[in-house]
């Protein structure tokens, strides 16, 4: 057991039992006493002199140590916690990040926004702030107006925009103003954007095809939905599906690709039509949005497992369909990793200048099966 006394310095990050005792002792006294600098020091596992240096900024303190002090101060309600936070931020470079998403009411993009906000709150090494806006449609104009409208208010811009010459030209104009742009999920503006951050979409398509071929009990037909021809990522996923079946499962026939505009109603109607016209339909892959429509159609017309359905992104709808086995697998973007990496790369671009060589920053997808949720 850890003895608690006025001068105890216990690192709660590495000794949870000690932390529990400290917090128990603190709560027993918090009604009678305001938290003091000694309480902060004990919970943070540092000396009172270190807390004093963080508070008053007299001497430099390592960022990790200052963060421990700040976390401890917030945790126990120390009155000067906001001041400690300001001290920590004072000498850090500024990063104002603009984020342009779409489909505001979709669960996935709400989760995206929440993870981006969390990453900004937890960012170290920069004074990060975030502005998030949502495009009302897939129109290139909607994206370009929102992106260029952020000029002068942000230091870097990241977007899930469509692939279109107008978007590319907007990125060129933003670059000329010294604002680096990052393509998220869909690799738009290749050759002029700073980085692409997302999944390797060709591999994603091959993963989907592999699962469908494995789950299907008999040879037959395969359907692929894409959101539209302006989504480069969807086209790469479609290519991955076709290349896998061509190489490893030629007994399956991949039908002509269907456009669903990422809407559930179009996907629902098209899926019911496919099931009616192709009794030997063995698998469906939704390369973009609209998966809710395919799930609803299969629930109406097929028993679980009769048609292998692979979709993207774990949402309440796809999780539920995994549980009842109308979805065979979900291929998900690791949003926490994406947002953390975005902040790191954006900070590097803002402090180091726009790179002459653009890169792709691939993330490992998260794969979910019925037994893993």
Model regions: which residues?
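Short, intrinsically disordered or compositionally biased N-terminal tails of bacterial proteins
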Residues: 1-30, 300
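N-terminal helix-turn-helix DNA-binding module of bacterial transcription factors
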Residues: 16-85
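Amphipathic helical "hinge" segments at domain boundaries
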Residues: 80-145
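Hinge/beta->alpha junction and helix N-cap segments in small-molecule ligand-binding domains
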Residues: 102-108, 131-142, 163, 186, ...
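Hydrophobic alpha-helical
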Residues: 156-175, 241, 256-317
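Flexible loop/hinge segments that line or gate small-molecule binding clefts
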Residues: 166-203, 315-323
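A conserved helix-loop-strand patch within extracytoplasmic ligand-binding domains
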Residues: 204-222
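Hinge/cleft segment of the Venus flytrap/periplasmic-binding protein
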Residues: 245, 334-373
């Amino acid at each position: 057991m850890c003895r608690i006394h006025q001068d105890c310095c216990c690192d709660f990050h590495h000794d949870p039992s000690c932390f529990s005792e400290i917090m128990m002792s603190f709560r027993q006294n918090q009604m009678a006493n305001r938290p003091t600098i000694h309480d902060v020091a004990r919970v943070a596992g540092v000396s009172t002199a270190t807390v004093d240096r963080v508070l008053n900024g007299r001497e430099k303190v390592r960022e990790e140590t200052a963060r421990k002090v700040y976390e401890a101060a917030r945790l126990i309600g120390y009155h000067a916690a906001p001041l400690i936070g300001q001290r920590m931020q004072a000498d850090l470079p500024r990063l104002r990040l603009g984020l342009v998403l779409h489909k505001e009411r979709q669960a996935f993009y709400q989760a995206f926004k929440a993870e981006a906000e969390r990453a900004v709150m937890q960012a170290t090494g920069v004074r990060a702030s975030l502005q998030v806006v949502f495009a009302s449609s897939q129109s290139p104009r909607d994206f370009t107006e929102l992106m260029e409208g952020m000029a002068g208010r942000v230091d870097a811009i990241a977007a899930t925009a469509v692939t279109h010459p107008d978007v590319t030209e907007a990125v060129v104009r933003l670059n000329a103003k010294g604002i680096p742009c990052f393509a998220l999920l869909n690799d738009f503006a290749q050759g002029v954007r700073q980085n692409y951050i997302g999944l390797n979409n060709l591999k994603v398509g091959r993963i989907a095809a592999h699962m469908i071929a494995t789950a299907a009990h008999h040879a037959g037909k395969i359907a692929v939905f894409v959101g539209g021809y302006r989504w480069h990522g969807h086209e790469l996923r479609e290519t991955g599906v076709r290349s896998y079946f061509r190489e490893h499962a030629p007994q399956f026939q991949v039908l002509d690709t269907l456009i669903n505009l990422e809407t559930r109603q179009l996907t629902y109607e098209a899926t019911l039509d496919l099931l009616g016209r192709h009794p030997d339909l063995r698998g469906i892959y939704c390369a973009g949005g609209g998966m809710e429509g395919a799930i609803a159609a299969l629930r109406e017309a097929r028993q679980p497992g009769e048609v292998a359905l692979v979709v993207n992104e774990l949402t309440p709808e796809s999780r539920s369909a995994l549980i009842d086995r109308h979805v065979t697998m979900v291929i998900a973007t690791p949003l926490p990793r994406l947002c953390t990496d975005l902040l790191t790369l954006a900070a590097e671009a803002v402090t180091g200048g726009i790179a002459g060589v653009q890169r792709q920053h691939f993330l490992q997808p998260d794969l979910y099966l019925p037994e893993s949720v």
